[in-house]
């Protein structure tokens, strides 16, 4: 049972998240010959003030 976690900044539409789940599932199924019914995709949206790069929060840039 593959479990894939995708972390990204907030702001994506439901349509984008739906497409992401579908495409990640397809890629994993094809790459490791896994049954798509057994593939789990976890989406973790991060607030821009909860993520930083180069010492600065994304929300402050």
UniProtKB/Swiss-Prot annotation:
<dbReference type="GO" id="GO:0016853">
    <property type="term" value="F:isomerase activity"/>
</dbReference>
<protein>
    <recommendedName>
        <fullName>Probable tautomerase BH3814</fullName>
        <ecNumber>5.3.2.-</ecNumber>
    </recommendedName>
</protein>
<feature type="active site" description="Proton acceptor; via imino nitrogen">
    <location>
        <position position="2"/>
    </location>
</feature>
<keyword id="KW-0413">Isomerase</keyword>
<dbReference type="Pfam" id="PF01361">
    <property type="entry name" value="Tautomerase"/>
</dbReference>
<dbReference type="InterPro" id="IPR018191">
    <property type="entry name" value="4-OT"/>
</dbReference>
<dbReference type="InterPro" id="IPR014347">
    <property type="entry name" value="Tautomerase/MIF_sf"/>
</dbReference>
<dbReference type="InterPro" id="IPR004370">
    <property type="entry name" value="4-OT-like_dom"/>
</dbReference>
<comment type="similarity">
    <text>Belongs to the 4-oxalocrotonate tautomerase family.</text>
</comment>
